[in-house]
Curated annotation (Swiss-Prot):
Residues involved in Mn(2+) 3 binding: E76, H87, H202
Coiled coil stretches, renumbered: none
Origin superkingdom: Bacteria
Keywords: Exonuclease, Hydrolase, Manganese, Metal-binding, Nuclease, Nucleotide-binding, rRNA processing
Gene Ontology MF, one: 5'-3' RNA exonuclease activity
InterPro entries attached to this UniProt entry: PHP_dom, PHP_domain, Pol/His_phosphatase_N, Pol/histidinol_Pase-like
Cofactors demanded by this protein: Mn(2+)
Reactions mediated catalytically: a ribonucleoside 3',5'-bisphosphate + H2O = a ribonucleoside 5'-phosphate + phosphate
Purpose of the protein: Exoribonuclease that catalyzes the last steps of 5S, 16S and 23S rRNA 5'-end maturation. Removes 3 nucleotides (nt) from the 5' end of 5S, 16S and 23S rRNA precursors to generate the mature 5' ends. 5S and 23S rRNA maturation occurs more efficiently and accurately on ribosomal particles as compared to free RNA. Efficiently catalyzes the hydrolysis of the 3'-phosphate from 3',5'-bis-phosphonucleotides as well as the successive hydrolysis of 5'-phosphomononucleotides from the 5'-end of short pieces of RNA and DNA, with no specificity toward the identity of the nucleotide base.
Protein name: 5'-3' exoribonuclease Rnm
Amino acid sequence: MGAALSDTNYAVIYDLHSHTTASDGLLTPETLVHRAVEMRVGTLAITDHDTTAAIPAAREEISRSGLALNLIPGVEISTVWENHEIHIVGLNIDIAHPAMRDFLAQQTERRQARGRLIAERLEKAHIPGAWEGALRLANGGAVTRGHFARFLVECGKAATMADVFKKYLARGKTGYVPPQWCTIEQAIDVIHHSGGKAVLAHPGRYDLSAKWLKRLVAHFADHHGDAMEVAQCQQSPNERTQLATLARQHHLWASLGSDFHQPCPWIELGRKLWLPAGVEGVWQTWEQPQISQ
């Protein structure tokens, strides 16, 4: 997968982490799948936050337009571990499975409750209208902290989304509300019940020391997690190698994904997504041909 690409002959690019307007992405499902093809992605997973609402529209557009794109139904589930918000991606799930549907309905209720509390805290800090602003920006999708961040940038409270999180939404700041999500174990369980593979999302992005990151990966593996994201767009070669080593040590499959939310200079669908030597791609768990009995 690390081989150079040419116009006529190139390896399949996998991007197994992306977002749409169903959560905090800026592209509709239809636009996202077309962009994926433009970026030469061959297999794309849509993994919106605690919702699978984008999958049917994406499937329909791929079929309608005859796109050469393999769509993997997915979801990114918010969990809490040791007072840290940790995201678990479910890949190749059955989005119609009753267990998954019921579970995501509960997650939506938790997300709405947290959003209202964030808005209340911002209101007390003399920033009115945050809930209405976040709802407007979500446009019918799940309300996330990203929508509050966009609202605050819109209001001139900060120059960038990153600045908003540092100033208002990070732990200890005005708009921070401790998450009340499910556990990692519960997320893994519902993903498995719906026929999918559980993946520890962007492990290098959490505010954890090397020691605590090792504890997180061990906890995830001990509770039957399947894979961890090893490769992302923005990442030092050293981090990619270290994550691959952790995956091997805990006998986890490797995943990779851009975590694409919107077109920007530094994150793009399929960009720099290759696995180091010594790890195996999680897609092999569903692409391997079945042996006939």
